[in-house]
Amino acid sequence: MDALDGNAIAGQLFEVFGVDLTTASGTCAGCGAVAPIAELSVYRSAGVVARCRSCDAVVMVLLSRGGSTRVDLRGMASLEVAEPNGATS
């Protein structure tokens, strides 16, 4: 099975979170690598599995069924999302 990049799940993530997460930085819980979601290796089957490009650990699983989507992020130690339009708190 050929891997896609994280841009392949941009639409699904936007539907769930309401923001573009492709530029968000995720930290792999396995190896500590930090990379944009767009750089994950994505595999589609019954659901979607996203893996760290550095260590191949599963960092995200997306399962859609019955009108809902489950997002499992247990392989991601953290996710940093920039505030929209450069807003500051």
Model-derived regions: residue spans:
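Short cysteine-rich clusters marking metal-coordination/redox-active sites
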Residues: 28-31, 52-55
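Short linker/helix segments within small regulatory modules
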Residues: 40-49
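Short, non-ligating residues that shape and space the ligands of small metal-coordination modules
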Residues: 37-38, 61
